[in-house]
Amino acid sequence: MAAEEMHWPVPMKAIGAQNLLTMPGGVAKAGYLHKKGGTQLQLLKWPLRFVIIHKRCVYYFKSSTSASPQGAFSLSGYNRVMRAAEETTSNNVFPFKIIHISKKHRTWFFSASSEEERKSWMALLRREIGHFHEKKDLPLDTSDSSSDTDSFYGAVERPVDISLSPYPTDNEDYEHDDEDDSYLEPDSPEPGRLEDALMHPPAYPPPPVPTPRKPAFSDMPRAHSFTSKGPGPLLPPPPPKHGLPDVGLAAEDSKRDPLCPRRAEPCPRVPATPRRMSDPPLSTMPTAPGLRKPPCFRESASPSPEPWTPGHGACSTSSAAIMATATSRNCDKLKSFHLSPRGPPTSEPPPVPANKPKFLKIAEEDPPREAAMPGLFVPPVAPRPPALKLPVPEAMARPAVLPRPEKPQLPHLQRSPPDGQSFRSFSFEKPRQPSQADTGGDDSDEDYEKVPLPNSVFVNTTESCEVERLFKATSPRGEPQDGLYCIRNSSTKSGKVLVVWDETSNKVRNYRIFEKDSKFYLEGEVLFVSVGSMVEHYHTHVLPSHQSLLLRHPYGYTGPR
């Protein structure tokens, strides 16, 4: 008997309801029951679940066709099935509960549709619990449901005599929160249909997904909040939608500089170009020619980089003479050879500093001759400062616009969110040039509105209770600000959920962010091109299904002011 007790089955993590029902043997009972919510936010909710008792494990699904369970637990260590009189309400007339021998473990509450159903479920659960312990109690079955009620419940509700030690149930059970029942759904019927079209199809792909998720099961010490539908693996696709800045950034760079792809491979100096474009410092002028001369010198001294490395002094003196006579030829060669000469300096940095003083002198001697050529190779790294020198006279016309008090703030707006490389991070560079010709007040407001959402707003969790805990931690007294908000991952489907603290009801409110045709919305009538513009809208417009709730404070963000 003791050897048998050590082999209590462990709930299977990802199995469809139909697959479980068709497994040979082991299914004691299956049917629909109402299950009490497991989190603090859902204690008053009793969603309908399809429950299967299989080999002394209880599984519950959203429906009989679900691809994976909402949760499951082993009956190991549970020693009593009782009526739950304290949970009886007008909606739950026939509740019952399954109690663990240890008070540290969860008590599970279910509600049947009739007295007969409750007797049947309780009798079968009692039989499963006593499988290894009380062979004499096995005659308890559904036929007892027709017997006297008091005698039936007296026999069923008697605790099973078991010992606690052999049951390692801490990390075997798991539960997926029924959070989709707690969302504030849109008032109009159309968004509901849109949700069906958008969200129901992904419910079936998850069955193959749990395989990469399997390492996560061992990481969960207490399993009552485990997410089994695999939203974790499905979530990476949405961030690329909001994280497109990186791709867009590369595209913008390629438009800005056609030779950028070539430079990206050989040299780490590429980041210098964007800096010069947006904020050209005059201090870089003497060093830029120095950076430009080594490529000219390497090509004029020898056709390949190998002869250049042995004798640095001799090559440098001869290159000075050659450069004085053939500067234009070398600069033309640079356009085709600038990839090859930049390879060696990365592998042999010491020679470059040794020769740099001579290059700088040469650069000081020949600035007029070089200034005539930069038009040919504006794309390379070095020619940027000369190219920017030319527009300086034009800049003399700009001071009339630039002295505006708003404009100096724009650089701060670009750099202020240290944690926010958002998909709008480069949107400032486009409006800034046209805005110089326009009147200042309106454009500066537009630029301000395009500040990206900080990364701290996106919380990497699927639990509303976890977000509530984070919100309360922001205040010493545990009272979050009204309108404090963040965006978390959805626990049931691929997508995002807007979580807002409602001070009037002293709780968080969840709004699923729907998406269709690259548009985002909380309710069907108002569509937005991005999550950022949607959040901006609800800073000044009341959220759906509420009288006065606005988005006011992004979580974890302290402004630059």
UniProtKB/Swiss-Prot annotation:
It is linked to Cherubism: An autosomal dominant syndrome characterized by excessive bone degradation of the upper and lower jaws, which often begins around three years of age. It is followed by development of fibrous tissue masses, which causes a characteristic facial swelling. Residues 26-130 form the PH domain. A motif (SH3-binding) lies at residues 201-210. One of its GO terms (biological process) is signal transduction. The gene is SH3BP2. Residues 457-555 form the SH2 domain. Binds differentially to the SH3 domains of certain proteins of signal transduction pathways. Binds to phosphatidylinositols; linking the hemopoietic tyrosine kinase fes to the cytoplasmic membrane in a phosphorylation dependent mechanism. One of its GO terms (molecular function) is SH3 domain binding. It comes from Homo sapiens. Phosphorylated. Phosphorylation at Tyr-448 may stimulate the activity of the LYN kinase. This is SH3 domain-binding protein 2. The modification Phosphoserine is found at S278, S416, S427.
